[in-house]
A protein has these predicted regions:
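A short His-aromatic
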Residues: 149-153
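A short glycine-rich, Lys/Arg-flanked "PGG" loop and its adjoining helix->strand segment in the class I
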Residues: 158-173
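Conserved N-terminal segment of class I S-adenosyl-L-methionine
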Residues: 1-138, 144-148, 161, 283-288, ...
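A structural helix-start
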Residues: 112, 154-158, 178
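A C-terminal cap/extension of S-adenosyl-L-methionine-dependent methyltransferases
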Residues: 2-24, 52, 224-301
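Conserved S-adenosyl-L-methionine
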Residues: 212-222
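Short, glycine-/aromatic-enriched active-site segment of Class I SAM-dependent methyltransferases
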Residues: 174-196, 200-205
Length: 301
């Protein structure tokens, strides 16, 4: 049984009952540890939920599908502990639960509001709220960490990555996705509280510096990247001429681009891309995707 650390304000160790946590005589739905919402808040969760068609946006669906495929390579048995960091509205949690019903799945976020909603929709998944940089989990306790679009919301991303390394068991894997191409950082990223976008080379170097071994490196959104890049460059040119309200309107328009029909077409393109991506990595795209491994012993470089 997974042992959760005692949250602040309590003396006894929490026990997961299958529907909630028992701490002494008290039952709680979520374990709440440290909170840091400098790079995310409840309003952004609601905004993304509304504008991205409740998890049906083509790039989000493709990201989740890619993550589940990577999980297939590392998921082992019913004792496998999978931690999703940044569960937000819970779409990936649901898909992992369906795809890997025998695993021990834990959801988490840096703020409690989305977790409270997940606990009502999916009461059978233990949920914990904490700041990744100050992660309360013990060393070597998790087999797989999945963090999609998380690191860009954390100011000290290297410290966050080191925490992921720390809590992984030797031989464990981390599946990471982040926005690609640092030169395309614009007001869209600012409004979504991204501290940065990433270049694949720099992300890989930081990961290796934290002790990881690189298992896979690729990009998502390779086929549609030229159009995406053009839009981002236009945003950078418009930045000085738009007020906050105009930026919000522009972001909503870009997220909803083309409506449901175009969204379905682009998802079909992403499916084709994911199929080809089984045999070859993509050198550029909308998102960087890394699968990292914590080695069993010291690395010789």
């Amino acid at each position: 049984m997974f042992k959760f650390p005692t949250p602040p304000g309590y003396e006894k160790e929490p026990v997961w009952t299958g529907r909630d946590f028992q701490i002494g005589s008290e039952k709680v739905a979520i374990l709440k540890y440290t909170q840091c919402n400098a790079g995310w808040d409840a309003d952004l969760t609601e905004f993304h939920e509304k504008e991205a068609e409740a998890g049906n946006h083509y790039i989000d669906r493709a990201s989740r599908l890619y993550a589940c495929r990577e999980l297939e390579k590392s998921e082992k048995d019913q004792n496998t502990v999978i931690l999703e960091i940044g569960s937000s509205s819970g779409y990936l949690l649901r898909e992992i639960k369906i795809s890997f019903p025998e695993s021990y799945l834990i959801g988490s976020d840096c703020i409690p509001e989305p977790l409270e909603k997940i606990s009502e929709k999916m009461p059978g998944i233990p949920l914990i709220q904490f700041d990744l940089v100050n992660c309360p989990l013990p060393d070597n306790c998790v087999d797989v960490v999945v963090a999609l679009n998380v690191l860009e919301h954390i100011k000290d991303d290297e410290a966050a990555l080191k925490q992921i390394y720390r809590i992984l068991k030797p031989g464990g894997h981390a599946i990471i996705e982040v926005p690609a191409n640092s030169q395309l950082y614009d007001f869209y990223d600012e409004q979504l509280k991204h501290f940065r976008r990433y270049d694949s080379r720099g992300l890989k170097q930081m990961s290796l510096g934290c002790g990881f071994v690189l298992s896979k490196s690729t990009h998502l959104g390779f086929c549609i990247y030229p159009a995406f890049k053009l839009i981002k460059l236009q945003n950078k040119r418009k930045n000085k001429h738009l007020d906050s309200n105009q930026k919000q309107i522009t972001i909503k328009t870009q997220i909803r681009f083309g409506g449901p029909i175009v969204n379905r077409i682009l998802f079909t393109v992403m499916l084709f891309e994911l199929y080809l991506g089984k045999t070859m990595p993509y050198p550029w795209g909308i998102r960087c995707a890394l699968t990292l491994k914590k080695p069993h012993g010291p690395i010789t470089r």
